[in-house]
């Protein structure tokens, strides 16, 4: 019997309404066993709503922290929720 690991893909996003939905769909298509976290880095468009509508977990940051800040927020989420692997 194999041990199943909890895997999370972290996707930082800032004003990506034009692409975030497709990216989340692609991850779910190719890696159906993983969860997707979109870190909405203070976007002013529909990034958050579109990511959520495609099945992603969305972490909304109140303002733009940049790629480093968004990734740190994602890693903190991984740690707090107890995921085994993050991508």
PLM feature spans:
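Structured catalytic core of nucleotide-sugar glycosyltransferases
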Residues: 1-87
